[in-house]
């Protein structure tokens, strides 16, 4: 039996929600290990849709233990609001079913404000990153700068007050420089103390809980957010998120050693999408992109922003397979390609007259890439709802097999519609 890490292999929005939902039913423990409430996904259970941003997917299933690891940045007010929203849908999230790592860094209102100040200023100069304005980046900055307020500090008012002083020394200097009013010590203390009693019952030593679960033979699912190409180191920097999104972060962001990670499953869309700014070599800013966006309902769960759409980029996904150590992929949204006469796949790039087989790290080089395409025959029959290989058109099977060859990883799960039952299981990631 293997523990499973789920990661996105593109720029996020690959359809992790459905796959994580399917896996979480089989897991005993579900862990969030990076990101914040900036990346959402929708779970559909018994016809009811649940939209989650911060909470692990295990919370909507009874009998599962859900954990928020130290690699997450934690907005306490968003946490309380999400729990209340689920309560309105009949889901009870309690300290028995959910634990938050005591050493998790907090997102405060001043982080959200700084995020917005910077994006507004960058918009005026044409240099914006396209963040969700939820304070994720500034919160990670404070964590790395060793001035973050962490969940455990809510239990110690004296230490909390000193840490707020230190935090405000930094932030008020920034706010003055950006031409904005300072924040008072009293305002931040009130913001934190007003919610402390609702947060502290959930706080625990997540690393110890995970080690006990591992020793007991529990099945652990590590739930990643965003995608590999948004990784702070391995993504299309600077148009990335502020955390490591690759599979290696599952260990760092939870406190369980890397040897406990078994199967790495890369969620991979059958075409490519991206939200916000940044390079996108296979983008189709034309009727093909419109078709993919409309057929695939490509709008963000959290922001509602329209996603940019393009052809499958085998070069980029192959690189993700390597940087994550993927054991296999879950290929999603194959049905969106139904009815297309021909389908293109990027198999290389042309950069300044030379052919390359990797995504360069340089921002300038990324902007100058010309994709090299291979054109495949499409299929007229539908793949939607297929649950076994024999249900698929021959050309769709060829497309899937060719992707496996190009990226160097097998398809473990093939998703053929948003419905959780509509999938072809080739390999159960939890089985050794």
From Swiss-Prot:
InterPro entries: Adenylosuccin_syn_GTP-bd (IPR018220), Adenylosuccin_syn_Lys_AS (IPR033128), Adenylosuccinate_synth_dom1 (IPR042109), Adenylosuccinate_synth_dom2 (IPR042110), Adenylosuccinate_synth_dom3 (IPR042111), Adenylosuccinate_synthetase (IPR001114), P-loop_NTPase (IPR027417). Its EC number is 6.3.4.4. PROSITE patterns: ADENYLOSUCCIN_SYN_1 (PS01266), ADENYLOSUCCIN_SYN_2 (PS00513). Keywords: Cytoplasm, GTP-binding, Ligase, Magnesium, Metal-binding, Nucleotide-binding, Purine biosynthesis. GO terms for biological process: 'de novo' AMP biosynthetic process; IMP metabolic process. It is found in: Cytoplasm. This is Adenylosuccinate synthetase. It comes from Chelativorans sp. (strain BNC1).
């Amino acid at each position: 039996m293997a523990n499973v890490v789920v990661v996105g292999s593109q720029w996020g929005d690959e359809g992790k929600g459905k796959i994580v939902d399917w896996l979480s039913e089989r897991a005993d423990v579900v862990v969030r290990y990076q990101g914040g409430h900036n990346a959402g996904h929708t779970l559909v259970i018994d016809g009811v849709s649940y939209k989650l941003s911060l909470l692990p997917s295990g919370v909507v299933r009874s009998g599962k233990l859900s954990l928020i690891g130290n690699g997450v940045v934690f907005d306490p007010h968003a946490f309380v609001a999400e729990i209340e929203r689920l309560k309105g849908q009949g889901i009870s999230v309690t300290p028995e079913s959910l634990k938050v790592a005591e050493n998790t860094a907090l997102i405060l209102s001043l982080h959200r404000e700084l995020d917005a100040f910077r994006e507004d200023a960058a918009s005026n100069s044409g240099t914006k990153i396209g963040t969700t304005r939820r304070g994720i980046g500034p919160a990670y900055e404070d964590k790395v700068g060793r001035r973050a307020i962490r969940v455990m500090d809510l239990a110690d008012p004296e230490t909390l007050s000193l840490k707020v002083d230190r935090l405000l020394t930094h932030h008020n200097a920034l706010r003055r420089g950006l031409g904005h009013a300072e924040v008072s010590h009293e305002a931040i203390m009130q913001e934190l103390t007003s919610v402390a009693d609702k947060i502290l019952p959930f706080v625990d030593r997540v690393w110890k809980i995970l080690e006990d679960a591992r020793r007991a033979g529990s099945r652990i699912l590590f739930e990643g957010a965003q995608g590999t190409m948004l990784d702070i180191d391995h993504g299309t920097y600077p148009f990335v998120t502020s955390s490591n999104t690759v599979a290696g972060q599952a260990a760092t962001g939870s406190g369980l050693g890397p040897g406990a990670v078994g199967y790495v499953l890369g969620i991979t869309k059958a075409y490519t999408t991206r939200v916000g700014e940044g390079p996108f070599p296979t983008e189709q800013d034309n009727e093909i992109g419109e078709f993919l966006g409309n057929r695939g309902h490509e709008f963000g769960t959290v922001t509602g922003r329209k996603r940019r759409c393009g052809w499958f980029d085998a070069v980029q996904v192959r690189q993700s397979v390597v940087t994550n150590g993927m054991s296999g992929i879950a290929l999603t949204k194959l049905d969106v390609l139904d009815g297309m006469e021909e389908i293109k796949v990027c198999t290389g790039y042309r950069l300044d007259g030379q052919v390359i087989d990797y995504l360069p790290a340089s921002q300038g080089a990324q902007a100058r890439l010309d994709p090299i395409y291979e054109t495949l025959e499409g299929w007229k029959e539908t793949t939607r709802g297929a649950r076994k290989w024999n249900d698929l058109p021959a050309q769709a099977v060829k497309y899937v097999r060719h992707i496996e060859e190009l990226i160097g990883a097998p398809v473990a799960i093939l998703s053929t519609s948003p419905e959780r039952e509509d999938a072809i299981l080739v390999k159960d990631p939890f089985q050794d």
